Amino acid sequence: MELYKLKAHELKDMISKKEVKVEEVTNSFLNRIEEVDEKVNALLYVAKEEAVNTAKELDKKIESGESLSGLSGVPVAIKDNISVKNMQNTCASKILEGYVSPYDATVIENLKKNNGVIIGKANMDEFAMGSSTENSAFKVSKNPWSLERVPGGSSGGSAVAVASLEAPISLGTETGGSVRQPASFCGLVGLKPTYGRISRYGVVAFGSTLDQVGMFARDVEDCALLTQNIAGLDKMDFTTVDTPVQDYSKSLNKDLKGRKIGIPKEFFEEGLDEGVREAVKEAIKVFEENGAEVKECSLPLSDYALAAYYIISSAEASSNLARFDGVRYGYRDAEAENALDLYVKSRSKGFGEEAKRRIMLGTYVLSKGYYDAYYKKALKVRSLIKNDFQRAFKEFDAIITPTTPTPAFRIGEKTKDVLSMYMSDIYTVPVNIAGIPSISVPCGFVSGLPVGLQIMGNYFKEDTLFNLAYSYEQSTKWHDKIANL
């Protein structure tokens, strides 16, 4: 049996029933990585020895009569900006090349506690800044559905790992759509939880008021399983909220009777690919067939979200990335003649083009004379956008839109057109600005490329998202499609 083709919940059940050993499952995925990763460049580090050792330990527990809870030995790929003790944590940047984390992020502690097997560190856009994974200092990840196209970003490697069957589930991070957009491009389920639902302790910061850990899976059940095992309050992250984590498995039912869904007209205007538009419209009919009431609504201020996002996120990046100075850790220029020279040369050579662009933009909008005109104004717009969503959620349980305006674009197509690249996040960014949860699920294909449907929910209503996404998924077969590598 080709175990790497199975989904996480199927593997969990087989391991629990002692039909297969954790080590067998782990080796199946390690062999798959060896077979296909050079084609798609999903991983920056393969944790072969660590994964096999963990698998053997879990098998010993099972043999001694202990039942494994949580993930029960299922492999997980981890984005390379999430700290895993004794593994590299490069953020796909030259400035952190060779850096090894001395501790586990809280989400990794939770994964280990719940018997997950970490199989490798995934490629990404440098410091999570990008929408294509072309900004990695080390390699360009490729979309398994078309190797000439991008997988999306910034969590492109995490998406590719699951879409190419190198891992059944994976962790990424979200600042402006970095899980949902690659999920859409790669035909996966991708969740961005509520800001504060999951700890960010041990995750390298980009935009601190926007960042959130997210997850990739091949179906909604797997996504719910992974979320269940990492969510919750953390004393190490004061932004986490003491709100009970529901049993998400109870939300996995098909009936949508009584559910009210809003369709915002602003997300279906000029710039949306016609094929994507038709796929999403067909998907909306399925929700109605399953009992939901669907009605047009308006989110008029969402048009301003992208501009506000790039001001706020760049300002926060400028502050967060100031710590990479060539002194304490990371890349240190050997030719520097004094302290100032060390800072300038280490940062100039260590950071890539996009990271430097955003640092400069952020420094500019925070500077005297421009703070009020840009940063402060962006924060005011953010508050108005939050209010827009809260008005909508007084009437609707969820809001449905396309995840991205187009399917995956070609590698190199948008690298010289920065604004065009930024526009690929136009439908995902409002969610991060508001801090609400959102899930992307596969809803069809355009010219052989996957298309994603986005479902937005109110704060801490991940259970509602899982209910709606599962209902749609069970009425279609898009989630069962696998890329042919």
Swiss-Prot record:
Catalytic activity: L-glutamyl-tRNA(Gln) + L-glutamine + ATP + H2O = L-glutaminyl-tRNA(Gln) + L-glutamate + ADP + phosphate + H(+)
Assigned EC number: 6.3.5.7
Active site: 79, 154, 178
A Pfam family that the UniProt record links to this protein: Amidase
Keyword field contains ATP-binding: yes
Annotated signal peptide: none
SUPFAM superfamilies reported for this sequence: Amidase signature (AS) enzymes (SSF75304)
Family: Belongs to the amidase family. GatA subfamily.
PANTHER family per record: GLUTAMYL-TRNA(GLN) AMIDOTRANSFERASE SUBUNIT A (PTHR11895:SF151), TRANSAMIDASE (PTHR11895)
This protein's name: Glutamyl-tRNA(Gln) amidotransferase subunit A 1
Organism the protein comes from: Clostridium acetobutylicum (strain ATCC 824 / DSM 792 / JCM 1419 / IAM 19013 / LMG 5710 / NBRC 13948 / NRRL B-527 / VKM B-1787 / 2291 / W)
